[in-house]
Amino acid sequence: MALGARRVAGVDEVGRGPLAGPVTAAAVVLDPANIPEGLNDSKQLSVKRRNLLGDALASSADISVGHASVEEIEQHNILRASHMAMLRALAGLRLRPDFVLIDGAMVPQGLNLRAQPVVKGDTRCLSISAASIIAKIARDKIMVDLAQQHPGYGWETNMGYGSKSHISALRNLGVTPHHRRTFKPVHHMLYQDKNVKP
C-alpha cells in the first residue's frame, strides 16, 4: 500500500450521521518512533482514554483538523462535505505526506496525493485510528460549545445525533441554524410548519 512512503497520513471523519453540527475530519502523520499505545477507533474508547490519547498525539504527531459546515452539507451532500473536510485536514498538515490512508471505500475527488481507501480503517490502521480520535475530540468540543448557545437539545451528550431527547427537543423548541435541513427528521419538522429558532 504505502511501500516506500516516509510520511504516511491517516485520515478519518466524524459526524456524517448527526442531525446537527459540522462534519469534521482529521489527518495524522504518526512519528514511527513515538506511537502512543492503545490507538483504536475513537468509538471504542472511553472519553477519558480518548482525551489522553489526543494529548499524546498532539505532542508526538503531525495533526490537522478540517470541517465542512452545515451550509456545505446542505449545498453539496454529506459525502461530498466529508471529503471537503478531509481535503482541508490534509492541507493543514505541517509537511505534505507521501501517501494517504483514508477510512472508507473512496478517495476524495481532488486529492493530488497517492492514496488508498481502507474499509474499516479506523480499526485496521494506526494512523487512521489516530485521525478518528483527533476528529472526534475536535467535533465533540464544537458540539459542547453549541450546546451552551442552544440549551435543551442535549448536544453536549448526543453530539447532534438523533437521540430520542434530541428529536423531542426538535418538536418542542424548533429547528436551529445548526440543524441539517435536508436530513429526514429535521426536514419533516420543517414540513410540519415548526418555527425555526433564530
Swiss-Prot record:
Q: Name one GO cellular component term.
A: cytoplasm
Q: Which UniProt keywords apply?
A: Cytoplasm, Endonuclease, Hydrolase, Manganese, Metal-binding, Nuclease
User: Which molecular function GO terms apply here?
Assistant: manganese ion binding; RNA binding; RNA-DNA hybrid ribonuclease activity
Where it sits in the cell: the answer is: Cytoplasm
Report the EC number(s), separated by commas if there are several: 3.1.26.4
Q: Which residues form the RNase H type-2 domain?
A: 6-195
Recite the UniProt cofactor note for this protein.
Manganese or magnesium. Binds 1 divalent metal ion per monomer in the absence of substrate. May bind a second metal ion after substrate binding.
Enzyme group, top EC level? hydrolase
One Pfam entry for this protein is: RNase_HII
GO annotation, biological process: DNA replication, removal of RNA primer; mismatch repair
Reaction(s) the record says it catalyses: Endonucleolytic cleavage to 5'-phosphomonoester
Q: Where does a divalent metal cation bind?
A: D12, E13, D103
The coenzyme or cofactor needed here is:
Mn(2+); Mg(2+)
Q: Which PANTHER family match?
A: RIBONUCLEASE H2 SUBUNIT A, RIBONUCLEASE HII
Q: Which family does it belong to?
A: Belongs to the RNase HII family.
Summarize the protein's role.
Answer: Endonuclease that specifically degrades the RNA of RNA-DNA hybrids.
Q: What is this protein called?
A: Ribonuclease HII
Originating species: Roseobacter denitrificans (strain ATCC 33942 / OCh 114) (Erythrobacter sp. (strain OCh 114))
This protein's encoding gene: rnhB
